Amino acid sequence: KIAPHRHNNFLIFRGVFWHTIQKLSLYDFYPTEYNDHNHYGPIFSLVIAPFAVVPDAIGLLLWLVVLALGMYYAVRRLPLEEGRQIFLYWFCAHELLTALQMQQFNIAIAAIIIGSFAAIEKGREVTAAFLIVLGTFVKLYGVVGLAFFFFVKRKPRFILALIGWSVVCFVAPMLISSPEYVIGQYVEWYERLAAKNGENTFSLMQNISLLGMIRKISGSASYSDLLVILPGLALFGLPYLRFGQYRHLAFRYAILSSVLLFVVLFSTGSESSTYIIPFAGIALWYTTSPWKRSGWDVALLVFAFVLSS
């Protein structure tokens, strides 16, 4: 028997499957089942299904094992020397443990972003498109995988795969429910995310990001986060103007690192368990940068580790 408060997130996740089967709202509050709301898309009902149909203890154990293995496999698929892969594992171990203790899908998001990059590097456009679409339809974060579009060798094939997988992910939950129900849940999903964004604004345990830092220090709720996000997007996009660098793997790794950092730094949903995503970016930045590491580089690495810990 597992204490309910210890695996609340997993209870929310498995509830997505059972509520889809029963055609109940995925975004209502069910205080007799778990605390908090679900914030994942309807396709998550199929992702979590294998772990929801078995007893809680077994499902939870398998869920954690699959999350950890997914991250391990994604890193192993990178065109990166084994020693650097091992460094990434050790550097991210603390954040991985934190996310595992909270049963969080953020581990899978990190794996999806890294995996989509690795697939593009290997010329597997269909696989990359699947990962990007799945991550987007589950938790939106996956959409940042489109940042690797300029590195895709066969762009028409990639675009067609994105469209095809989007159709599949949109209609797939209908197999265990109905078209009307699923379409209605997509509408509710948008409304729940909008509400959650407002709830996170001054939350102590949420919005642990650049957006949240500025918001909480200023104490102002009157301005739009776009005032911070748009300049951030502009800075993020500047490296893409270096067209001649696209052919260099070190440059592409720098973009991957930037993507992994950006998705959390500019999200109001950032919390402790999301930091597995940017930590992977920090480790990749340190191990793949083409210049000799300076004392400042080491200091930044240590600062990030200590700050998060």
Regions found by a protein language model. Give the residues of each.
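Aromatic-enriched
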Residues: Y286-S309
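Interfacial segments of multi-pass membrane proteins
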Residues: F150, R154, L284-W285
